[in-house]
Amino acid sequence: MRIDPSTLNLKEKVVHINRVAKVVKGGRNFRFSVLVVVGDEAGHVGVGTGKSIEIPEAIRKAIEDAKKNIVEVKTVGTTVPHDIIGKFGKGEVLIMTAKEGTGVIAGGPVRAVLELAGLKDVRAKSKGSNNPTNMVNATIDGLARLRTVEDIAKLRGKTVEEILG
């Protein structure tokens, strides 16, 4: 089920800008590759990449791409319903629940994703790959796989009370 980005009040954040080169006979052709995260700070977040000769054009393309890849994030109050490990390539991000007032404890690119997803109290630890693309996509993977107690009860055909015991 795709989420329509036009109905959301999206904010965007440039996570990483990389200058890439194509070596040709006459020298090097430089381009810019940009990684952007978009989110409404209310449970929707997406990531996209864009490439162009000029940075503003690359950012525009990345934002367009990110709007096509928006996922819904399940939350319980200001945190995540349970701990989860998101994986992408060799990058792993462990997203953990936190008490109210903790804030967002996460490094670099992961922090941007969690803040734009609307999470206020959450901890994250990244393992493996330090590549911003892998870290951001691993975070998105983890957030997309989150489930609330209500979701699990519905899947099993039981009530929430039966699940919680």
Curated annotation (Swiss-Prot):
Gene Ontology CC entries for this record: cytosolic small ribosomal subunit
Keywords: Ribonucleoprotein, Ribosomal protein, RNA-binding, rRNA-binding
GO terms, molecular function: rRNA binding; structural constituent of ribosome
Top-rank taxon: Bacteria
GO biological process: translation
Signal peptide, first to last residue: none
Pfam family of the protein (one): Ribosomal_S5
Residue span(s) of domain S5 DRBM: 10-73
Record remark: domains: The N-terminal domain interacts with the head of the 30S subunit; the C-terminal domain interacts with the body and contacts protein S4. The interaction surface between S4 and S5 is involved in control of translational fidelity.
Family: Belongs to the universal ribosomal protein uS5 family.
Matches recorded under NCBIfam families: rpsE_bact
Subunit details: Part of the 30S ribosomal subunit. Contacts proteins S4 and S8.
General function of this protein: With S4 and S12 plays an important role in translational accuracy.
PANTHER family reported for this sequence: MITOCHONDRIAL RIBOSOMAL PROTEIN S5 (PTHR48277:SF1)
Protein name: Small ribosomal subunit protein uS5
Species: Clostridium botulinum (strain Hall / ATCC 3502 / NCTC 13319 / Type A)
Gene: rpsE
